[in-house]
């Protein structure tokens, strides 16, 4: 019988080779598992973390937040408006070809809103009734939506085939956020008069009807992705 007097057996060498190969493959896979992105679009500015679940699936968590001021006129009243983006999103991506193309859906914790302040001159008509501006004072308004919203869309993440480095992403879709709700209040001495409160409620209802189409909000975002 011939015995080996030292050195590893062929089986042990093969096993060690397989373990080393698996370790290298695992390390390469982990390098593709994580990504951070900075995004900008119709939902504001945001940051996002993504984690791949194989070749075709990924999950993403992101936050959008920013503010934009502008002016607008409604029912003869000039308003200073602040459009506030504040949302936290959790979504799932499906890559049907395993490449850049992705189909996305998810949930949004939605605190997007519009805040308004209206300064009145002379007289103003509210709910069909004309009031003196000194009696009404300033008008303050807010437009809000459901706290929970859902979204769906299509996009492309051209960084997906990189092991690490920087790429670009693009997403378009629609956000279902429920019917907009309008609240108005006045700072003047008639603010608590029942008849004025009724007219203010009528003004709120009219404004809600004018912006009812905002329950479905199209969006588009572009991002710079760092994959590691």
Please provide the spans of the model-predicted regions.
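Transmembrane beta-strands of outer-membrane beta-barrel pores
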Residues: 42-44, 63-69, 107-113, 158, ...
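Transmembrane beta-strands of outer-membrane beta-barrel proteins
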Residues: 34-38, 47, 55, 59-61, ...
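N-terminal secretory signal peptides that target proteins for export/translocation
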Residues: 1-11
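Outer-membrane beta-barrel "beta-signal"
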Residues: 93, 215-228
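Outer-membrane beta-barrel strand-turn architecture
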Residues: 51-55, 96-98, 158-162, 228
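A membrane-pore/channel beta-structure motif
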Residues: 31-33, 40-42, 52, 66-67, ...
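Extracellular/periplasm-exposed beta-strand and loop segments of Gram-negative cell-envelope proteins
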Residues: 63-88, 112-149, 178-217
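N-terminal signal peptide c-region/cleavage motif recognized by signal peptidases
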Residues: 26-27
């Amino acid at each position: 019988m011939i015995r080996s007097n030292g050195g590893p057996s062929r089986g042990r060498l093969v096993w060690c080779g397989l373990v080393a190969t698996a370790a290298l493959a695992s390390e390469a896979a982990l390098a593709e598992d994580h990504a951070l992105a900075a995004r900008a679009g119709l939902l504001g500015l945001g940051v996002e973390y993504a984690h791949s679940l194989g070749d075709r699936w990924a999950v993403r968590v992101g936050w959008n937040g920013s503010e934009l001021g502008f002016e607008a006129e409604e029912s003869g009243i000039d308003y200073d408006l602040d459009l506030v983006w504040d949302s936290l999103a959790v979504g799932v991506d499906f890559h049907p070809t395993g490449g850049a193309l992705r189909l996305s859906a998810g949930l949004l914790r939605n605190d997007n809103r519009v805040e308004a302040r209206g300064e009145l001159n002379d007289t103003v008509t509210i709910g069909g009734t004309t009031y003196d501006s000194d009696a009404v004072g300033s008008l303050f308004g807010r437009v809000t939506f459901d706290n929970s919203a859902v979204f769906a869309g299509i996009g492309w993440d051209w960084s997906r085939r990189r092991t690490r480095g920087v790429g670009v992403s693009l997403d378009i879709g629609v956000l279902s956020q429920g019917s907009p709700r309008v609240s108005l209040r006045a700072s003047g001495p008639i603010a608590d008069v029942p008849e004025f409160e009724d007219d203010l409620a009528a003004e709120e209802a009219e404004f809600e009807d004018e912006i009812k189409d905002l329950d479905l909000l199209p969006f588009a975002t572009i991002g710079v992705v760092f994959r590691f």
